[in-house]
C-alpha cells in the first residue's frame, strides 16, 4: 500500500481535514477514498496507471478523489479550478486522460470535454451517496508506480506535465517532514492552489503523512485568513510572497484594536514559510515586524519538489534560500560540468 495512505490507519480518529467549518477524520477519508476507488475501478482489478483528471474546490472531497485515484492504481491529474476551458482541454489532451472526476459546481465548465473527447465523467456527489455493498479488495500499488502529473507554470512556453511516481512523492514528503519537524499535533491552513507542488506536497501531503490536520479555505480571502489565525488553532502557514504582501497591506489598514487581536494569534505559530517566487527583503522585514516571525525561504521546482531550505531552527539569512534539505545533495558546476569552488556561480545540480 502507498505509505501516505497506510499511515492514515494509525490516526483513524484524528481530524485530517477541516473545511467550511466541518471536520473529517482519517477514518472518514479512508472510507470515502475507498468508495471513489471502487467507482473508478468498476469491474476492473487495477486502473494500471490510467490518467484520471479531477476538478473540485479545495476541500475534503479533493483529498478523497486524489487518494481514490491512487488506491485504484491510477495517475492523478489535478485541474486548476480557475483555468479557462482551453487550458483544461490542453491538459486532458496532453495526458490522454480516460476520465474526469468533478463536483457539480464545475459541471458547466467541463461539459464541452465530453463532446471533444471520449471521456468518462464521474460526479463526486453521485459517488458519495452510493451505498457500498461489500468490503472491496483494492489493488496493491508498488511505489515505483506513476502516481501524479502536475503541470509547470509554463513560463517558457506551454505548461509541461511532470510525472511523479509514488516513490518520488514519498521522498519529497519525508524530506520536508524531517527538515521542518512535522508532528501529528500540527495544524496548517492551506490557501494555495491544489494543482501545484506547494499546495499539494508541501502542505497537504506533509500534514496527512504526519497525522496532522489540514484546514482549507475554498477561496483566497485575506480577512478569512486572519479570522482563522485568531482562532489560535493553526500553528503553521505557507504562502507565496504576493500573499504576504496582501496580508501586510490589510493589517496596516486595521484599527489598533484589531491589529492587537491578530498580533496575539501569531504567538501560536511555530513556522511560517514563503516560496514559489523570490521573497523581497522588504516584505520579509515588514512581516517580521508585524508577526515576530522570520519567514523561512526555500527553493524547489515542479520537476523535483523542494531541494533547498533555510534552517528551521538556525539563522535565516534574508535573500538566501539556504542549504540542501534532508536526503538532498546539491552541487554547483561550470559549463564543463566540473564542480566549482565556493563563491563561483554556475549551474545547480540536484540529487
What is each residue range found by the language model?
Residues 3-25:
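AMP-dependent adenylate-forming
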Residues 22, 37-83:
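Conserved AMP-binding/adenylate-forming
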Residues 25-27, 147-174:
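Conserved AMP-binding A3 loop
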Residues 42, 67, 71-140:
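Structural core segment of the AMP-binding/adenylate-forming
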Residues 134-151, 158, 181-187:
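Conserved pre-ATP/AMP-binding loop-to-beta segment of ANL
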Residues 170-187, 197-236, 246-251:
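Conserved AMP-binding/adenylation subdomain of ANL enzymes
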Residues 331-351:
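Conserved beta-loop-beta connector loops within the AMP-binding
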